[in-house]
Amino acid sequence: MNDRARARKLADRIKVVVAETLERRVKDPRLGFVTITDARVTPDLREATVFYTVLGDDTALAETAAALESAKGVLRAEVGRQTQVRFTPTLTFVPDTVPRQARQIEELLARARAADREVAERAKSAQPAGEPDPYRFDGAAAADDDEPAT
């Protein structure tokens, strides 16, 4: 089996095991509303990075990070028990910044849409600076120019 495929499967299993263990066994009051979003394992299967998000402010994020650090041993033992790999990967917990960045991008897009609507409203009542159609060909003036000189 390909090492990358095995690492991907192990990462998926670690994600599930960590999420279930946090829900059922870890009873730390500092642990807020945490969601395990992703897990990645190195090709040698020795280290796993677990990404998480927390509902709340930066204080809740810091408290959850401390709770995850203190529960790291229990989580690693459970991962080893349920995955039955020769070497249980070392767990590293990293806050996932994707939801925060997505929210910022959505806010920027909303501002851009509002600015576009404002420009469209202004364009409806705008008047040209010069003639309404500067390239319009006036037929009467052209008829005088087309007559041959006698």
Curated annotation (Swiss-Prot):
Per the record's keyword annotation, is Disulfide bond included, yes or no?
Answer: no
Q: Which InterPro entries does the record match to this protein?
A: KH_dom-like_a/b, RbfA, RbfA_dom_sf, Ribosome-bd_factorA_CS
Keyword field contains Cytoplasm: yes
Could you tell me which residues belong to the region Disordered? 119-150
Q: Name one GO cellular component term.
A: cytosol
Which Pfam families does this one have? RBFA
Q: Which GO terms describe its biological process?
A: maturation of SSU-rRNA
The domain of life for this entry's organism is Bacteria
**Assembly behavior:** Monomer. Binds 30S ribosomal subunits, but not 50S ribosomal subunits or 70S ribosomes.
Q: Which NCBIfam families match?
A: rbfA (TIGR00082)
Name by which UniProt lists this protein: Ribosome-binding factor A
